[in-house]
Amino acid sequence: MRRVTLYRYSVPMEAGVVLRNQRLKTRDGLIVRLQEGERLGWGEIAPLPEFSVETLAEAESAALEQLQSWVAGQAFSDALPPSVAFGLSCAQAELDQHLPQAADYRKAPLCSGDPDELFEMLQAMPGEKVAKIKVGLYEAVRDGMIVNVLLEALPDLKLRLDANRSWTRAKADGFARYVAPSLRSRIAFLEEPCKTREESREFARETGISIAWDESVREADFRVEAEPGVSAIVIKPTLVGSLARCQQLVKDTHQAGLTAVISSSIESSLGLTQLARLAHWLTPDTIPGLDTLDLMQAQVIQGWPESTLPLLAAEQLDVVWQS
């Protein structure tokens, strides 16, 4: 006997979370609970505004159609919006006990704001020092100066930077001018510095600063391949699609000799813990990019270890549909 519950959550965000052109006041998504006999499987469907191709309403419509078919004994379709494909495939994998329980709860802290506070936090970080900084929000020159100061002050620090394609080539060069050439190798990667792939490639070749593909991974013409100056592929399952698609991307990335990084699209704690399990399974040697929980004011159903945020139980969520 197959049974389904589809829930909707809406969690208030901390002030100041801006996605491209809009301030995100709440994080809204769907939680799927599959049941077959005694077995349970959970999944999260949470398109990210400004980044996902599908809206939450479109995702809900697609999920409802699939879940009704699933209850009737059908398998989930392969042709689904990415967030729906990811959430349903996670729930199915949990149900079938194919998603390992072991998780990688290490996270590259997402840093923003005051360089002095940043310095104190990074200095106190145990083990491998890897942090992520969003660049491109302020002046490129300021970004370059902060990166340079941090790398100079903390000799064992590696930085992951993310520009979200926000720079012209001239601005990207302005950033690079303020990072000493001797420190550039400790930038693990800079995600998509320029507005076009070709400009980003040229930037990497000419500055010696490694880049990573992120937005490009979701474009129809993208192929994983080794090329000069590219060191990593950032995989955001909510934006990419099913577990099978993520597995294939990781495999292709490793075969090309590149680093694969599993990364968050600001999922709830339930989705984040599943991403931590996925990272432990598929990319055990790489710290995942999952430091987004503190952007929210509550957790959902499954808590993240050591988080003190309040936890919403399933009973506190709205039920969209139940079989």
Curated annotation (Swiss-Prot):
Gene3D superfamilies linked to this entry: Enolase-like C-terminal domain, Enolase-like, N-terminal domain
The EC number(s) this enzyme carries: 4.2.1.113
Protein known as: o-succinylbenzoate synthase
Entries under InterPro entries matching the protein: Enolase-like_C_sf (IPR036849), Enolase-like_N (IPR029017), Enolase_C-like (IPR029065), Mandelate_racemase_C (IPR013342), OSB_synthase_MenC1 (IPR010196), OSBS_N (IPR041338)
Keywords recorded for this protein, A-Z: Lyase, Magnesium, Menaquinone biosynthesis, Metal-binding
Family assignment from sequence similarity: Belongs to the mandelate racemase/muconate lactonizing enzyme family. MenC type 1 subfamily.
Pathway(s) per entry: Quinol/quinone metabolism; 1,4-dihydroxy-2-naphthoate biosynthesis; 1,4-dihydroxy-2-naphthoate from chorismate: step 4/7; Quinol/quinone metabolism; menaquinone biosynthesis
SUPFAM superfamilies associated with the record: Enolase C-terminal domain-like, Enolase N-terminal domain-like
PANTHER family: O-SUCCINYLBENZOATE SYNTHASE, O-SUCCINYLBENZOATE SYNTHASE-RELATED
HAMAP family linked: MenC_1
Catalytic activity from the UniProt record: (1R,6R)-6-hydroxy-2-succinyl-cyclohexa-2,4-diene-1-carboxylate = 2-succinylbenzoate + H2O
Any Pfam family matching the protein: MenC_N
GO MF term (any one): magnesium ion binding
Role this protein plays: Converts 2-succinyl-6-hydroxy-2,4-cyclohexadiene-1-carboxylate (SHCHC) to 2-succinylbenzoate (OSB).
EC class name: lyase
Organism, as annotated: Pectobacterium carotovorum subsp. carotovorum (strain PC1)
Cofactor(s), by name: a divalent metal cation
Residues binding Mg(2+): D162, E191, D214
UniProt-annotated catalytic positions: K134, K236
GO biological process: menaquinone biosynthetic process
